[in-house]
């Protein structure tokens, strides 16, 4: 089982090494959905492998049979087995606690902000179900959830023409329909658990950028790409409030350039290769459990 722990640690190290390469890969902007799937697989596999390393090391003295290991651990336990078990338990508990805390905090923030928007915002029948807040600062964002809201400021209505405004609104509706908030939330919790790990910080940044690209692509199906890029540049300094997703929160210049000078989509064989790679990465933790049983 010590060999299994070494193999699991090696697999985790490989994932951490590959993260910067994936963050710098240019093909991701050509297939954001496929890239996002791969990032999700990396996040899942990395978190589970970190737990498996500690658990496998803790059970190593008892041999390869996990059930027998629970009954046959030596008394007293070696200090390193106790340390490994404590670290694994602490990491798991912190990860679950941060995930629950982040989820509850985000839900509360959105509920509070939604109530505030309903109190102070006005509705414009020409803008569908969009809430308009009285602020000169140009900002557009959505509040996802069971009762979503798309919010724009009067500054946006002043800064954008009609076509640009409708493009931005469709971008925000894409976040709502595709539930991008559920994609981002686990990575935010992972960063809160491992705040000093560069690979985790890179993953959060890239996932945020990719969901914005997906929303851009959905909006670009109904609107001119140049119009959307121009709208992003006009409100590019805005920041969505906590709990919200905004059209201008991640990589505005990169996204505008992508809209104005679109690269050809990643060919189907390339997308298939990415999906297979994501599947292989997601199965690494399963292999980490099977190997000790072999």
Where are these regions (language model features)?
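Hydrophobic transmembrane alpha-helical segments in integral membrane proteins
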Residues: 1-14
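Hydrophobic alpha-helical transmembrane segments of polytopic
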Residues: 9-12, 42-45, 84-90, 277
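Transmembrane alpha-helices and immediately adjacent membrane-cytoplasm interface residues
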Residues: 48-64, 68-111
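Membrane-interfacial entry segments at the cytosolic side of transmembrane helices
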Residues: 268-276
